[in-house]
C-alpha cells in the first residue's frame, strides 16, 4: 500500500497535532530550544507515528532535536490530554531544511541578478 494518499481525517488530525504541539512547546523551558517553528506534521495511516518537521530562527538543529526528542514523552502526554483519538502517535522530530534551501536559492538569484546588471 505504498503511496496511498492520506485521508481527509488524517490531514485534520495532523493539523490539530501541529497546533497543539505549538502550544505545548511554548510551555517548555529547555534552554537548548531556540525559536522553533513547526512547519508540518505527517501522520502514518494507523496514527501510530507522526513526523514533526521543524525549523529554527535561533539555535542549532542538533541541540534543538535533542531537546525535542527528550521532551517527546511530555509532548505526547499533552497531546493525549487534548486529542480525541484512540491512538496518540509517537513523535519523531525532523529538522526541515527547506527554509535554508530557499534562502540559498534567493541568494543565488540575487547574485545572478547583480552579476547580470553589472554586465549590462
Curated annotation (Swiss-Prot):
Please name the GO terms that the record assigns under molecular function. Answer: ribosomal small subunit binding
> Does the keyword field hold Cytoplasm?
yes
Q: Matching Gene3D superfamilies, A to Z?
A: 3.30.300.20
Q: Which residues form a coiled coil?
A: none
Name one process (GO BP) from the record: maturation of SSU-rRNA
- TM regions (residue ranges): none
Identify one Gene Ontology CC term for this UniProt entry.
Answer: cytosol
The cellular location(s) given in this protein's UniProt record come to: Cytoplasm
Chief site of localization:
cytoplasm
Q: Which UniProt keywords apply?
A: Cytoplasm, Ribosome biogenesis
Its annotated function is as follows: One of several proteins that assist in the late maturation steps of the functional core of the 30S ribosomal subunit. Associates with free 30S ribosomal subunits (but not with 30S subunits that are part of 70S ribosomes or polysomes). Required for efficient processing of 16S rRNA. May interact with the 5'-terminal helix region of 16S rRNA.
- Describe the protein's quaternary organization and the partners it interacts with: Monomer. Binds 30S ribosomal subunits, but not 50S ribosomal subunits or 70S ribosomes.
What family does this chain come from, according to its entry?
Belongs to the RbfA family.
* Entry-linked NCBIfam families: rbfA (TIGR00082)
Descriptive protein name: Ribosome-binding factor A
Q: Which organism is it from?
A: Verminephrobacter eiseniae (strain EF01-2)
Taxon lineage: Bacteria, Pseudomonadati, Pseudomonadota, Betaproteobacteria, Burkholderiales
Amino acid at each position: 500500500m505504498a503511496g496511498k494518499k492520506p485521508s481527509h481525517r488524517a490531514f485534520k488530525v495532523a493539523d490539530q497535532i501541529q497546533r497543539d504541539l505549538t502550544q505545548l512547546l511554548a510551555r517548555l523551558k529547555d534552554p537548548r530550544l531556540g525559536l522553533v517553528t513547526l512547519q508540518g506534521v505527517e501522520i502514518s495511516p494507523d496514527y501510530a507515528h507522526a513526523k514533526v518537521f521543524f525549523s529554527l530562527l535561533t539555535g542549532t538543529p542538533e541541540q534543538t532535536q535533542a531537546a525535542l526528542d527528550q521532551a517527546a514523552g511530555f509532548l505526547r502526554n499533552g497531546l493525549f490530554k487534548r486529542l480525541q483519538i484512540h491512538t496518540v502517535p509517537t513523535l519523531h522530530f525532523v529538522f526541515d531544511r527547506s527554509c535554508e534551501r530557499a534562502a540559498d536559492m534567493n541568494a543565488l538569484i540575487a547574485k545572478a541578478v547583480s552579476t547580470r546588471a553589472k554586465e549590462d
